[in-house]
């Protein structure tokens, strides 16, 4: 089953991504309320720090980039990219602890947080076109164009369950 938590624009508008703190009903079997509250509040704070243009790290990163004609980003990397990598690892760790798969927040364009339960009988019809093709056996990451809405979620599957799952706990 796919659980999609869409971005909440009422908190910060479009300055930086934030997600609602509501407890998602489909995840109750996997995550308790306290763990969810800690996760979502920490995630929102990390996203604010990473995307807020007026944070100290982002200001220093921008000034250093301009002064070095953006060479510093290639040599040292940017603080923003490091923070986004840490956020991806934080989400991955949370999903792993609670026996869930998660789509990379970067691949989802920071518009939605998508979890997939590890039930073998529930697959999304949008994640694969032909499960018996050889390419299906080598899929290790979630395609970036996949979205899960109520119109394209399939909770049952007619193909073999011994094929590898197309969702992985990986970040790109």
Swiss-Prot record:
InterPro entries reported for this sequence: Golgin_A_7/ERF4, Ras_palmitoyltransferase
Membrane topology recorded in Swiss-Prot or TrEMBL: Peripheral membrane protein
Key words of the record: Endoplasmic reticulum, Meiosis, Membrane
GO terms for biological process, alphabetical: meiotic cell cycle; protein targeting to membrane
Disruption phenotype: Abolishes palmitoylation of ras1 during vegetative growth.
Annotated S-S bridges: none
GO terms under cellular component: endoplasmic reticulum; endoplasmic reticulum membrane; endoplasmic reticulum palmitoyltransferase complex; Golgi apparatus
Residues covered by region (Disordered): 152-172
Main localisation: endoplasmic reticulum
Keyword Endoplasmic reticulum belongs to the record: yes
Places the protein is found: Endoplasmic reticulum membrane
Function: The erf2-erf4 complex is a palmitoyltransferase with a major role in driving sexual development. Palmitoylates ras1. Palmitoylates isp3. Palmitoylates rho3.
Family under the similarity heading: Belongs to the ERF4 family.
Subunit structure: Interacts with erf2.
Name of the protein in question: Ras modification protein erf4
Provenance organism: Schizosaccharomyces pombe (strain 972 / ATCC 24843)
Taxonomic classification: Eukaryota, Fungi, Dikarya, Ascomycota, Taphrinomycotina
């Amino acid at each position: 089953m796919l659980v999609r938590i869409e971005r909440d624009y009422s908190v910060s508008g479009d300055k930086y991504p934030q997600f609602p703190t509501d407890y998602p009903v489909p995840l109750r079997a996997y995550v308790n309320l306290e763990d969810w509250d800690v996760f979502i509040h920490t995630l929102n704070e990390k996203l604010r720090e990473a995307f807020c243009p007026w944070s100290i790290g982002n200001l220093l990163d921008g000034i250093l980039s301009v002064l070095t004609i953006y060479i510093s980003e290639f040599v040292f990397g940017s603080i923003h990219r490091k923070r986004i990598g840490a956020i991806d690892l934080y989400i991955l760790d949370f999903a792993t602890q609670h026996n869930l798969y998660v789509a990379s927040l970067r691949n989802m364009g920071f518009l939605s947080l998508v979890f997939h339960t590890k039930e073998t009988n529930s697959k999304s019809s949008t994640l694969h076109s032909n499960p018996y093709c050889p390419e299906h056996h080598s899929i290790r990451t979630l395609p970036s164009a996949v979205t899960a809405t109520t119109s394209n979620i399939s909770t049952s599957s007619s193909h073999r369950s011994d094929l590898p799952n197309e969702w992985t706990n990986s970040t790109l």
